[in-house]
Amino acid sequence: MPVKKRTPLKHKSVSFSDDITQTQHNHHHRKKQNGERPPVFIRKTWLTIPWHLIALVYIYVKVFNNYNTAELLACLVPLQILYTIFQFNKATIYGNKRLKFNYSLAAISILACIVLSIPVVVIIILFGAPLLELLWETWLLALHCSFLAYPAVYSVLNCDFKVGLWKRYFILIVVGCWISCVVIPLDWDRDWQAWPIPIVIGAYLGAFVGFAYGAYL
């Protein structure tokens, strides 16, 4: 009687490489679906120090006649744009690389600051500013606050609307305005106590602190 040959059993091997590859693929796919964006941060460098804001405060107080807030705004806007191009944007890192300056986006940011000044006017009035009597001065103050935040506004638009990092700059401008309010009701009868002169100066000082030290906060 012939002996039947046994067929050798095949040993099953378990490999996790396919599972790992599939898991990595699914994780990468979920990142795309969730719209995960690269990190953004500001380099700790002297480039972010806005020395021009201190110079503008000095000119506003010592050079301009009667604290001309409109002339100060005319000086602020171009200097803020230049500061963003040559200083702040060079210190902004998005996704481990420095972004090139987008000039069309810079123009859009100017319009965004003008539009932003409208809700800022409303907020200032809600905090006690004259409603109609000094509306022009209040709007000038709102424009100053908006354009002081111009580098942050541009960066929000340029970094896919990641606003978390940039909130500190807006907050410090507001804090500067709030602290400077204390001198208005004091009975000193000084010209610089008139609305909105001390608030403008406080906004500039708050912006200076924000942009100079924002990377360290």
Curated annotation (Swiss-Prot):
GO terms for molecular function: mannose-ethanolamine phosphotransferase activity. Pathway: Glycolipid biosynthesis; glycosylphosphatidylinositol-anchor biosynthesis. Disulfide bonds: none annotated. This is Glycosylphosphatidylinositol anchor biosynthesis protein 11. One of its GO terms (cellular component) is endoplasmic reticulum membrane. Glycans are attached at residue 102. Belongs to the PIGF family. It comes from the Eukaryota. It is found in: Endoplasmic reticulum membrane. Acts in the GPI biosynthetic pathway between GlcNAc-PI synthesis and GPI transfer to protein. The gene is GPI11. It comes from Candida glabrata (strain ATCC 2001 / BCRC 20586 / JCM 3761 / NBRC 0622 / NRRL Y-65 / CBS 138) (Yeast).
